[in-house]
Amino acid sequence: MKMKKTLAFIMTAALTVGTMAGCSQATLNYAQELSNTAKWEATTSSIDGDLNINVKGKDGTETKQEIKFAATGYTAKDKSYVDMTFTDPAGKLNIPELKAYCDGTTSYINKSFYQGISSLNGQSAPTGLNNITQEYIGIDTEASGVDVTKLKALMTQPDGMVEFGKMIFGGNADLDLPFVQNGREYTINLDADKTVDLAAKALKATANNLDNLNSTFKLGLPAESITQMKTAANSPEFDKSLPEIKASLAGTTINSKEVFTDNDYSSDFNMNLQIKDFGTIVLTMKTTDTKSDVKGITFPTSTLKVSQEEFNKLMIPGTKTTIAPSTNVVSK
């Protein structure tokens, strides 16, 4: 339980770096830069990253795992694609290639990716998934009731990131990103204490805004669960746990540097997690986006379009669920 709580704080802080509502001038300037890139008619992107996990056993032994990943992508208005590969230098893990396409509100991912992920833990892919004859599975986010078009349009507004942050954390949340601005370069440097404090504020704000999140994103959370999460986040026990979490993350650093020009954007992200009684997790990632000319995207033709609910049923181990032809759109 202690480890789960620690990792929850880590992930919340990392995600908050990209989505938090802010009010400082540096944050507002950063939001303006993001909105400018969102207005590009077309964007070519690339990602290169390296994840290293070192787990220390109670007997002094160490288990190491490294995963390298790289991706290329292209976006033009509401259409995009990305091709992502994963490499294990030690050859222990065989993570499948991810090929994803987005056409408006529908996102398609290659079926072989889902099958390969299922086999990583030694299990066979769900029968319902294997029974699909099409090569790509598309999930229609519009069917969930979430206005994806509205969310995308929001990001083109000068204060789009700030407004999106308010949507997640609430309009009265006392949150801001600790940006240091130097011209068009924005850096963030967090240690263990700053990481935990930032994550704690974000978790509390999110919990107190769950009613709005539940309705906006159609999460389907029952009222009882929302009440329980609000109570937990605002309890004295929550605040009392923070010093212990800070101590367990002593030595941790999270750093990011983002640079904007009129025609491109680059980001360097480094996360060095030092977790007491566990080990280390180090993630480095470099991202580049370049303003590009508009070109057509060739979408896969062997596709099956389903709702999120139908997809969830397909992924249940041992299920033999099939999708009725009348509930989806198939092209081949």
Provide a role label for each language-model segment:
Residues 1-10:
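Bacterial N-terminal signal peptides that target proteins for export
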Residues 18-22:
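C-terminal motif of bacterial Sec signal peptides marking the signal peptidase cleavage site
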Residues 24-332:
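Subset-of-secretome marker
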